[in-house]
Amino acid sequence: MKKRLIACMALAVLVALPGVSAASQALFLQKCGACHKKGGTAAPINPADKAGQVWEKYFERGRHPGDPGASGGDLKAIIDYLKAHAADSDQPAAAVIPK
């Protein structure tokens, strides 16, 4: 049931945010949402919380502990998603991690 809810929410956001890579968004929801959901171990986030360059530098400087299960390619896709929907982007995203 929970997986269906996440899939439905992801689909709704995809429709609302044209040009989003479905795979990148799915990684964001899965990997980031594991901790950054309401009641999770980390504060809730959404891409529009920061400017694109801030997201990139945040990860470059190693400030985020990361997901031990995320490969380098997954992390790049997540960062690309965050930058594409950051506060200073053409399509800033509202919160998309299920609460």
Predicted regions span which residues?
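Bacterial N-terminal signal peptides that target proteins for export
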Residues: M1-M9
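N-terminal, post-signal-peptide region of Sec/Tat-exported proteins
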Residues: A42-D80
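Bacterial N-terminal signal peptides
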Residues: C8-A16
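Sec/Tat-exported extracytoplasmic proteins
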Residues: H36-G39, F59-R63, L82-S89
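Sec/Tat signal peptide C-region and signal peptidase I cleavage site
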Residues: L17-A23
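The canonical Cys-X-X-Cys-His
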Residues: K31-G40, I78
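C-terminal capping alpha-helices of c-type cytochrome domains
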Residues: G69-K99
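Residues immediately within or flanking Cys/His clusters that coordinate Zn2+
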Residues: Q25, L29
